[in-house]
C-alpha cells in the first residue's frame, strides 16, 4: 500500500484523489479512467479518440458536430487539443457551463419526431422546426426542401404527391374519402340507366298497342 500513500493528484472532473492504477493523463490534466468522458454524450473516451475545447473533453463525433462544422469556435483536430495551463479549474468549469447553456438553451422540438433540434441540423418553415432527416414527404418519404414542399393539414408533401393526391381530384379531400364517395355515385348511375331502359320498353309497348288497335279499326 505504500505505492498509494504519496498520491495527492486530484481528478479534473470529480476532484477526488487519483491513484496510479486508475490514472489517465490528457493535456497535462489528470483524470480517473471512469471520469474521462464526453461532456456532451457521457461516453467513455480514450486518448486516441477525443478532442477538447477550453479544457472540456468531447468524443470526436460530438466535437465535430458542435464545433468543427460551424467554423465559429476555436478547434483542434489532431487528437491533442489546445491547452492553456494558466486557466484554473473554476474558469474551465465556467466555460464548460457557458457552452452547455448554449446548447441546452436550444429547446426547439422537431415537429415530426418531437426530439430536440440543434441549430446545425435544423430546418425551420413557418415557425416550425424539423431535423433535416425528418423533413420529408409524409406520403412517399421523398426528400424535400423549404423551397419545394407543400404543407396540408399539418402534414408535409412533395409537390408531385400533393398534386397526385389532392389537386387532380379538384378538391382537397383525402384520396380515401373520395374513393368511398365514388362507389355510391356509380350505383346511382347504374340505377338511372336501368330506369331509362324501362321507360324505353314501356314506350315501345304502348306504340305496339296503338298500332294493333288502328289495324283492328280499319278491318
UniProtKB/Swiss-Prot annotation:
Single Gene Ontology MF annotation: actin filament binding
Biased composition regions of type Polar residues, renumbered to the chain: 203-219
Residue ranges of domain LIM zinc-binding in the record: 9-109, 110-167
SUPFAM superfamilies for the chain: Glucocorticoid receptor-like (DNA-binding domain)
Keywords: LIM domain, Metal-binding, Repeat, Zinc
Positions of region (Disordered): 181-219
Compositionally biased region (Low complexity): 185-202
GO BP terms: actin filament bundle assembly
Reported tissue expression: Pollen.
Coiled-coil zones: none
InterPro entries named among the record's database cross-references: Znf_LIM
Role noted for this protein: Could possibly involved in controlling pollen-specific processes such as male gamete maturation, pollen tube formation, or even fertilization.
The protein's name in its UniProt record: Pollen-specific protein SF3
Organism: Helianthus annuus (Common sunflower)
